[in-house]
Amino acid sequence: MNTQSKVYRTGEEIYDNLPCDSYFNMNAIRNLGIPTTFPTIGTFTLDSTTLGLQPQGQGPSPQQQQHQQQQQQQQQQHQQNMHHHQHQQQHMQQQQQQQQHQQQHQQQQHQQQQQHQQQQQQQQQHPTIGMFDANEVNDVIQNPPQIGVFQSNSVLTNGAGSGSSIFGSQSSNSSAAAADPSQTTRETGIIEKLLHSYGFIQCCERQARLFFHFSQFSGNIDHLKIGDPVEFEMTYDRRTGKPIASQVSKIAPEVVLSEERVTGTVTTELRTDSANNVLNSSETTGRISYENRGECFFLPYTKDDVEGNVNLRAGDKVSFQIATNQRGNLGACHIRLENPAQPVKYRGVVCSMKESFGFIERADVVKEIFFHFSEAEGNVELRPGDDVEFTIQTRSSASVPPQGREFACNITRLAPGSVIFEDVDSTVYKGQVLKSLDRNNPVRQNNDPLPGRIRYRALDYSEVEVPFGDKDQKGDFTLRHGDWVQFLLATDRRDQLQRATSIALLDETFKVSGEKREQGTIASLKEGFGFLRCVERQARLFFHFTEVLDTSREIDINDEVEFTVIQEPGLAYNNSRLQAIRIKHLPPNSVQFETLVASNIEGCVTREAPKSPIKSQDRVEGGVITYEHADVKKTIMYFLKDCEKPPRIGERVRFDIYMVKRNKECIAVNVQQVSLHQQQQQQQQQLHLNQSNAGANINQNDQLGGLSNGISSSSSNASLQNGYVMHGSPGGSTSSVGSNNPVHLDEFKMENNNHAGSDAGQVYRGFIAVMKENFGFIETLSHDEEVFFHFSNYMGNPNWLELGQEVEYTLARNGNTSVSGNCLPAENVRMLPKNSIPQPAVLETTHNGVVARPLRCINPDQQEYAGLIEILDELRTTVISQHEFGITSLVNKRDLLQKGDLVSFRIDESGRAACVNAVRQKKRATVDSIKGQFGFLNFEVEDGKKLFFHMSEVQGNTVALHPGDTVEFSVVTNQRNGKSSACNVLKINDRPDRLISRLKLNGDDTVPRLILIRAPKGPQGKGFSVLARHPRIPGNLVE
């Protein structure tokens, strides 16, 4: 009994000490029909358990063959008796189905023969090892790797040296795949999530997250936890076709650290060369001894395991953590010298701070350490990014969950730049991006702080890959796989890890990759983003400032850039929009929105261009010019902004043909009248003759329109009057706008002064018609169009300008028409004294009429600028007369006359309406509120909303207007958007002094009133007192 127990313990120890490199499937062994009864230990057999892993060179002994034949005969006889008994029962129950019974009997006999043949094959392939007794145990103990003549590891590793399967030919496909791991590729991963019957694995070698069912895990599922490393095979689900993980098994991590730190003594120090302080190659490891439960253990360590850049000597007291590698070997790591008299000083940088604690990134190891604010020496206030010096203590308390937690103590601040983590090489390398950063999934970047990869050729012409992070680029622009970049190498002093930094994108990328690049200009800028005007796109394109490649250059409007267009990532395709990335600045005049096709083409105007372009189906309609090209008659569109002077129908013009890149349409640019150009040459010749004529009474300044009122006359057929070309003027006569003879104004045909073919210094006059936030429009003397002007071109303070004010200006021949529409902008705008421009005399008769057409500032869609008033008969069915009006015709220049408004007016000598005054119904209401430059009246319009009014519509002193005041006003409805507002707001009386207080009080004096004699106080915010926290005995009142 003692011998057997000794053998049993010895065999158990042998089995525990044998290394296990794989596992076998128990279901496959059960299918082999292994008997469950075995002989006693003294004469036990291993014939069924080992399945014949004996080498083929040794055959079974005669005793083993005889014993094997007896067992087979007993099994066959037992099976035949069982089948014969079943056959008799079926024959008695199924006498009517004799034929079916015979077929079944034949099938059963066939199965018996097959089973008999399989058993014989198994016996031939897997002969028994032999029989052992207790006397042979000593030999087994002396040679533990071999039992008999085969390796003990072979039982678990499928025979090690033999090619036969451990499960025989009858094993299933799944067990055969498990036995031969070379058939499929095994991957490693980390358990990310576990649910009630399934989980998810995060792959280590690639960015993938695979589903797995608990039935695919080989082991106790209760032992599997989140974060455990596992090994698996990737397959595809038959129903959904998605990749899943199968045959999941738990593996040991590469290095397992003990939670607690252990103290010990250095017994063998690292040998270094004292002269050069270089590690001796003969002694690369040292040894540390420590005690555990009365036993002494020795652990190896290397120089990389020592913290603080200190040299350990024999006998030094140290603390360390025990690490277990993948092979199960133990070692010491994170070794720290423990010297209470002179503690080791460590350095680092404060990386994060909370309410009363923070973390320091250590400069000696890649690790962060905890610290409390109270550990800072003196009154030093630490901030993130400060360089500090500290000591390390290990504290153990019940309040700290991890026992033996490390704390930073005695923290002192160092000078900025004292702590250096890495050394940056000055050599500029050129490489190619293998793996770009996935900025749309920051969760995956947290797992790897350096997820990017760049491949470059080293100095020894070897291919090297280096990682990089999200802060290593010169900017946050988008990097793609295959981009060519230049960078610097930064080497971490702590672990000698190299990474790429100062990464800049090379222009070679766009040339090699064939990436489609587009051009445009910056149209507008916001906070952190902006919009581009594209050459080949109609809509503006969104972009982030971070996508600009040149971070040293400021972004300004009208900068010419080159970019790539993509769909905005992170959104569905229906909701996503286009955006520009990888934006590169271009030299000035590099971007051309139009391409010159032909120049100096002559044609004839067949349709005049409208003064305001008409949009129809996303297309702007302009004028039409007909010309001949290669004996083919063609038409081309033109706009007023591209003309020096608006041509009329039938006039001959010369122009250049440009093709717009965004819509591939051709337009006429630089349109000039051929006849006008010749006329200018004739006028210049005539002026030259007049100057040489000694008897001429008109000097050169008079011919250029230098009179005070802007009117000039000459003996030529065409005279200039206020910048207008007057045709048909009587020779030698002088005309004036303010003349009492109205016949002169009817005889002349006034041309548009905005594009007159005169010199750039020609001075024009007009009236302020519209004023916006930083620009406005000037109504010309002919009252038929407006001229755009920016406040920056006004010579004076634009706040002093008023509607209807008389001004003079010059025109910019080639000005910026993108902001002024089709009309050229005005420059050098100056205010004139009142009544500087004479006006026609106004008749005294007052008429009533209806506005048939408002001014173009009220309705920008109409082509005519001037408004129109109709005088109707008593039945309001027949139009008696029509009269145009402008900004100078209005009594109240801020009055917005709309179509259908009733007005009273007079008529001047030219037939235009003057002294126009709107006839509106006056209403009264009280002021509800005033908010800066606008307010609201207690007058309900538009579904109960209060009526809006602007402070500019208030007549009189606007400061005296307060909420509650009674005002008189008129209601105006904007026909474009349907919104109503109040105009001509006039204050009637003030609000009563105690109106609000009287409204709150009840007017009935007979009922009781609630009077407030003391206002309530809020809580102090200091919490309860200390006495309120003391326990008290129920029933006893404490005073």
Swiss-Prot record:
Family of the protein in this entry: Belongs to the UNR family.
Gene Ontology molecular function, alphabetical: lncRNA binding; mRNA 3'-UTR binding; mRNA regulatory element binding translation repressor activity; protein-RNA adaptor activity; RISC complex binding; RNA binding
Effect on the protein of changing residue 233 to A: Does not affect association with the 3'-UTR of msl-2 transcripts
CDD domains, per database record: CSP_CDS
Outcome after substituting residue 225 to A: Decreased association with the 3'-UTR of msl-2 transcripts
Protein name: RNA-binding protein Unr
Location of the CSD domain: 186-250, 261-337, 345-413, 428-503, 517-585, 593-673, 763-831, 846-919, 922-987
Known role: RNA-binding protein that acts as a regulator of dosage compensation in both males and females. In males, acts as positive regulator of dosage compensation by promoting assembly of the MSL complex, a multiprotein complex that mediates X-chromosome dosage compensation. Promotes MSL complex assembly via association with roX1 and roX2 non-coding RNA components of the MSL complex, facilitating the interaction between non-coding RNAs and mle.
One Pfam family from the record: CSDE1
Stretches for region Disordered: 49-126, 165-184, 721-741
Subunit structure: Interacts with Sxl; cooperates with Sxl to prevent translation of msl-2 transcripts. Interacts with mle; promoting association between mle and roX2 non-coding RNA. Interacts (via CSD domain 7-9) with pAbp; promoting translation inhibition of msl-2 transcripts.
Annotated effect of mutating residue 977 to A: Decreased affinity to RNA
